Amino acid sequence: MVQRITVIGAGSTGHSAAAYLTQRGFTVTSHDDSRFSSRFEDISRLGGITLRGEAHGTFMPACLTTDPAQAVHKAQAIFVHVMADRHEEIARRIAPYLEDGQHIVIVPGNLGAFVFRSVFREMGISADVTLTEKEGNLCPCRLTAAAEVTVGLPIDAEGRAASLPASDTGRVLEALKGVVEYVPNRNVFEGVINAGNVTNHIASTLLAAAEVDRRGDDFSLFKYAFTPAAVHCITKIRLERQAVIHAMGMQEHENPMDMIERVLNLKEHPEVATFYEYMNGPNSLDHRYLHEDCGCGGAFAVSAGKRLGLNCLF
């Protein structure tokens, strides 16, 4: 069974993953580059990563390091929790130190496995490692203080994933049992086409652009963006994406409108109160809600739809 895990990424999800896996008894190394050294210093100074909201406790990873060689050495699984625009950077950073038998899991996938594979081939990496993408993220969360992350919905070790190539999926998921309990997607495309952020983030952010500019750090998509007109637009986008999914011979995994409906009806859905209250953002239009969700899932959905002969307008 996998015991030694490296979590790459010192953002909110990286903090959550490192604390969560430490809580469950794994030997966790938390890694990012020197730009994030102050965050590791905060964790050391404060005695660990504090989880608040829908997770609780303070947990100290076994190792905090900005050294990629130290981070990768002897890791059985490497979970990559960074935005898609950092995938190439991370691939180049860890490539020289990879060892046979390691499993690299990209969360969320966003077709990052293709980037990692391309970099490894370019650099002539011969280590026998696997590349796997999880559909969606570990949990919604935000850094709310030094070494503190507020989790908006319960952290869940379940989900869907696929490897690149897909023929590796079965053995990877078997190796990761006890760490995560993923069920297999057909391939990495099934994961990215089903990403909920494509429908919920892009249209609502664009339609709320003026309010984002006005409120800045005080803006919350879930408090201010889901107006009737925005919800109508998101519904249309969901239907267009459904058509692409079906044309690909796949099924929609979840109704992305469910979360919006819960947020708009808080009295009937107290389970999303923490999510609603603390998951702020975007604070500007230069934000992952646009450049990541448009550039990954959105662009893929449009491209796939066009190749399949559909008239994709979203």
Regions of interest found by a model, annotated:
Residues G57-L98, V105:
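Rossmann-like NAD(P)-binding element
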